Amino acid sequence: MLVFVTVGSTRFDALVDAALSEPVLSTLRDLGYGQLILQRGNSVIESERFNEESCTIQRHGVDIETWKFKPSIQAECEQADLIISHAGSGTILDVLRLGKPLIVVPNPTLLDNHQEELASALQILGHLKATSIQDLASTIASFEPRDIIPFPPFDGSKFSKLVDEEMGFI
């Protein structure tokens, strides 16, 4: 099985370090995830080899492919059995619309902690699981994708109706 981890375009060294840590990789391996793809953006990793544009290694029984950026992460999201992500709104909505199991880790270093608010709201609605860097391994271990409530499909007619009502067309 495949796990895709993405930090987006903002540096999130702590999530990259956690994803490559022994506790997280061992937990993933024990749950049957043998492959991890890591989009690390501009994050800095201690191992110099990881700081190349892309590389592939094996660590703690998990095959790891890592790279900085691609024009689109759609293919990786579609292939993944589990997605672990920063809590950016664009990434969250893209993943939820695909119906993929999603664990989000808000980046606490960002201004006004807006990622935490979004992650918390969507977790309360049951659409994803939110966690911290410190609890990532235990969250993965206890995560039950079948308990996730599917995100409702986009319905553009609601917005159109609202505009029509406000404009007095209806």
Residue ranges and their predicted role:
Residues 143-170:
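C-terminal amphipathic helix plus adjacent low-complexity
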